[in-house]
């Protein structure tokens, strides 16, 4: 059996600071009376721990609704190579994690989607 660890509430701000040392931290943030969205956070007080569902699921970080794949320059096709930033996505629900695992299988097996894999 795996050990279980608990983070006391008073230690969470220091934990968040440590996560920020790894990259930009995204977490559920209240955007209206009943709506939440994953946004970059700087302080623990910005995080909506009560969020049940966000407007867009965390898959938006791996498979955005729109993106540039190729561009043209003087009749030549150029593949667009955006360098992804390192992100920490906090507050992802288990069902979303399971969905991301399925997306990994789809986009990494067979002919891999290089844009997805890079993220």
Language-model segment annotations:
Residues 1-119:
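Iron-sulfur-associated redox domains of electron-transfer enzymes in respiratory
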């Amino acid at each position: 059996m795996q050990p279980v660890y608990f983070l006391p509430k008073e230690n969470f701000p220091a934990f968040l600071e440590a996560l920020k040392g790894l990259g930009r931290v995204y977490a559920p943030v209240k955007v209206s009376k009943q709506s939440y969205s994953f946004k970059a956070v700087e302080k623990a007080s910005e995080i909506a721990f009560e969020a049940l569902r966000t407007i867009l699921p965390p898959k938006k970080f791996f498979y955005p609704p729109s993106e540039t794949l190729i561009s043209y320059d003087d009749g030549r096709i150029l593949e667009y190579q955006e360098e992804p930033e390192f992100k920490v996505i906090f507050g992802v629900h288990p069902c979303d994690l399971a969905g991301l695992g399925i997306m990994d299988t789809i986009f990494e097996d067979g002919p891999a989607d290089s844009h997805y894999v890079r993220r």
